[in-house]
Amino acid sequence: MSKVDFNKETGPREVFCGLTSIVWLHRRMPDAFFLVVGSRTCAHLIQSAAGVMIFAEPRFGTAILEEKDLAGLADAHEELDRVVNDLISRRPEIKTLFLVGSCPSEVIKLDLATVAEKLNLRFSGQVRFVNYSGSGIETTFTQGEDGALKALIPLMNSTDDEKLLLVGTIANNVEDRFKKIFNSIGINNVESFPPRQSTELPKIGKNTKVILTQPYLSDTVRDLKHRGCEIIYAPFPLGVEGSTKWVLAAAAAFKIPELKVHEVIAPLANRARQALQKHTEILRGKKLFLLPESQLEISLARFLHNECEMELIEVGTPYLNKDLMEEELNLLPDDTKIVEGQHVEKQLDRVRASCPDLVVCGMGLANPLEAEGISTKWSIEMVFSPIHGIDQAADLAELFSRPLTRNQILTSKTLATY
C-alpha cells in the first residue's frame, strides 16, 4: 500500500444526508417510488436537489411528520397507512415503494421495517415494499444508495450462472458502454445492480463476480459476500487509468488475457488522453483541497493528480473502507494527506492556510469560500454527472477546469474595468 499519511478527525461536520440519493435512484428505477417519512425540511431538501416541481408528480414524496406526531399525540403508523393507500390508488404504476427513514422518524422510533412487512401482506402481488434509512444521523448523502441496495438484496433470487455484476448507480449510457466493452473482451453475461426496473433484480450466487462502480457501498458489498458473491477489488472507473485498471481486474477474474483487453480499449484510451490535454493545461500544478462529503474524494484525487497533474494538499473523506479503497490508495503519491471524518472548523482553517487553487466541497461551504476568493467545485455534481468510464475522462476533468477558467475570465474583466 502507498505510504499515505492517514489522519482521523471527529467533530462538527457539514454534509448532505442520505435522502439526497433518492434524486439519482428514482431516475434509475422509474417503476419505483421513494416515500420519505420525515419533516417539511426533508421535503424541501429533496425537491430542491431534484429540481422538480411537485405538481410534475415526480416518483418521490414525503409523508410529513407534524408536531403532533413528534409529540406522540397522534398515531404516526395510521397516518402513514393512509398516505400509502392514497398513493397506491393514485399511482397504480408503482411496482416498488421504498419507505425511507429520516432524522425525525428515527427520533420517534417509527418502525418502518414492521410497517413495510404489513404493507407487503396487504398489497401482495401488487406493490413490493422495502425500507431503509436516509437519516443524517447515520448517513452522508451517498450512503443512502448503500442503504437502498442493501434493502433489495434479500429480494434477489439465487443462481449458479457465471456472471459479472456491476454494482452502483451509473448513467444508462455509461452502463451501455461498459457492457459493450465487456462483451468485446468476452464477458457476455453482464448485469447491473440497481437495475433499470426495480422488478428486474439480478439473480446472484457463488458464481457471481461483483465489481463496484461506486466506492460508497460497504454494506451492500458485505451482504453480497454473505450471499456467496465474489468481490473484485479494483480502482474505480474514473479517468483513463482507473477505468483501464477496472476493466483489467474484471477480465482477470474471468481469466481473459490482458492483451485482449488492451486491444479493445487502447483506441478509447488514446482518444481520451488527447481530449484530456486541454484540461490538463489548465489544471497542471494547481493546488487541490478535497473536503469530505461523497466518498468519491480518494478516486477523484488519484485522477486529478495522476492524469491532470494537480497537487494534492489534503484529501478528506467521510468514511474510509480500506478494503474497498486499497487499490486506489496504492495509486496515490506517497505522503498524500488523507483525513477520515471531519471537524469542519479545523478543516476550513487548513483550507485558508494552504491557499488552494480549487476546493471540492459541499454546497453549504462553497459560497462562503467563494466570497473569500477561493474557487470551489460542488462535490454533489460528481454524483449527478455521468463521469464514469474512459470516454468520460475529459468531461470529468472539465468539471474541475471550468471553475478555474471562469475565475480567470472574471478576474481579467474586473481588471479591465480599472
From Swiss-Prot:
Its cofactor is [4Fe-4S] cluster. GO terms for biological process: light-independent chlorophyll biosynthetic process; photosynthesis, dark reaction. One of its GO terms (molecular function) is oxidoreductase activity, acting on iron-sulfur proteins as donors. Its EC number is 1.3.7.7. Keywords: 4Fe-4S, ATP-binding, Chlorophyll biosynthesis, Iron, Iron-sulfur, Metal-binding, Nucleotide-binding, Oxidoreductase, Photosynthesis. Binds 1 [4Fe-4S] cluster per heterodimer. The cluster is bound at the heterodimer interface by residues from both subunits. This is Light-independent protochlorophyllide reductase subunit N. It comes from Prochlorococcus marinus (strain MIT 9515). The gene is chlN.
